[in-house]
């Protein structure tokens, strides 16, 4: 899990400025759900022409005692303005509830107050309460930070199992509808569009177990994952900087830019970058022949692009040249985490033949000598747990893309990723 790019977008640089180096990559991912939650009815158009809002969900998976709390303080600072407004509205709601209960069964009860936008929700909120908060949020995002991923189970509701996973999937999908119909007059009957950004932390073991039943159903591909590398035994304790008024003051203009944005925002540079990164992922999928990687990369690219859009808006709708390297890093890191934590389990779930390996995907071309035979290509595929039948198509793609050249019926020569380090241009 590589360290951050040298030159960071100013907002990210600020948000990790008080964080010890070992935690910086995790914080750089984990700040996005709360940043995105400041956008209200702001839409961006992806390269498939579908409009998205900044739906960002983040899970930090790291060992016990790794310092998962490192994300808390930056998020507290980002959420400060939303919490202030929530506080006022929670007070209004409390006053109304007290008034209603004190009046007993009298008829002159005041209606529930208007405009009760309360964005930050309790981690253990029930399903009906979630639907009601969503309806009252008037197009704003709900947000929560879970100290442990299984706190999500409160959202299961009494109905079918796995409703919390359905909520995760729907939150990511534009134009979703979710709700419940109840008969009782006091019950919540609402259909809402879920706008829900969240952060959760968990140990690697618990995280794997939590998602083990839904490996192929979509939540994993819609969530952004990050981690903290294991510390050396006996290493010095990381020391944090101080979050002071100067930090808040520097953060303020970015938050204000997010809050005042509206409507469909066009960011041509983010659009171009999404196209470029999609191609880069497709290239790696062709070379590693990993279907799991390819499938995960589609939504990972949407997540990375949404982060680019959030940075763009926070920066006053100005693109900065540091964005590209950061977003590329962010995408590669997200995919590396997904492959490391879930790759082989997803493969097993998809393939009953049980052939798998626990490493992430590898570039098969790199594993072959500079000149190789058809049989060697078959062998490399099988060593990596892939079938022999796909060899012909793989070689055809490599030749078509200019990675390799066919010399005879059975012999091939590498043009790229050669052991001698010299790339050859096939047009020469």
Model region roles, listed by residue range:
Residues 1-428:
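Phosphate-handling catalytic cores of nucleic-acid transaction enzymes
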């Amino acid at each position: 899990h590589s360290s951050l790019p040298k030159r960071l977008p100013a907002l990210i640089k600020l948000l990790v400025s008080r964080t010890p180096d070992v935690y910086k990559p995790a914080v750089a991912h984990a700040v996005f759900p709360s940043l995105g939650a400041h956008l209200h009815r702001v839409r961006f158009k992806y390269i498939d022409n579908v409009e998205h809002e900044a739906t960002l969900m983040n899970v930090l998976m790291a060992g016990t005692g790794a310092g998962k709390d490192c994300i808390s303080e930056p998020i507290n600072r980002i959420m400060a303005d939303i919490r202030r407004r929530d506080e006022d509205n929670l007070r209004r709601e409390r006053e109304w509830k007290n008034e209603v209960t004190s009046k007993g069964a009298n008829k002159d009860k005041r209606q529930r107050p208007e405009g009760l936008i309360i964005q930050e929700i309790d981690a253990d909120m029930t399903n009906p309460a979630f639907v009601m908060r969503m309806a009252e949020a008037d197009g704003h995002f709900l947000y929560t930070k879970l100290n442990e991923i299984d706190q999500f189970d409160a959202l299961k509701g009494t109905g079918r199992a796995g409703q919390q996973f359905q909520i995760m999937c729907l939150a990511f999908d534009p134009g979703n509808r979710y709700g419940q119909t109840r008969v009782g007059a006091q019950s919540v009957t609402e259909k809402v569009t879920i706008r829900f950004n969240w952060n959760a932390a968990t140990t690697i073991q618990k995280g794997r177990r939590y998602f083990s039943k839904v490996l192929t159903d979509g939540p994993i591909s819609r969530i952004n994952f990050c981690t903290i590398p294991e510390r050396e035994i006996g290493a010095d304790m990381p020391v944090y900087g101080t979050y002071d008024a100067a930090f808040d003051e520097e953060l303020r203009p970015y938050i204000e830019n997010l809050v005042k944005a509206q409507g469909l925002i066009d960011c041509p540079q983010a659009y171009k970058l999404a196209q470029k990164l999609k191609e880069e992922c497709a290239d790696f999928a062709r070379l590693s022949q990993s279907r799991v990687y390819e499938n995960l990369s589609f939504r990972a690219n949407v997540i990375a692009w949404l982060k680019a859009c959030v940075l763009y808006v926070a920066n006053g709708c100005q693109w900065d040249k540091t964005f590209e390297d950061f977003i590329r890093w962010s995408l590669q890191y997200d995919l590396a985490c997904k492959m490391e934590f879930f790759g082989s389990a997803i493969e097993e779930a998809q393939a009953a033949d049980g052939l798998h390996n626990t490493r992430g995907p590898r570039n098969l071309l790199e594993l072959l000598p500079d000149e190789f035979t058809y049989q060697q290509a078959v062998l490399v595929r099988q060593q990596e747990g892939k079938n022999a039948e796909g060899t012909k198509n793989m070689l055809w793609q490599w030749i078509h893309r200019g990675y390799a050249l066919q010399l005879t019926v059975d012999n091939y020569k590498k043009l790229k990723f050669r052991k001698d380090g010299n790339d050859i241009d096939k047009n020469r």
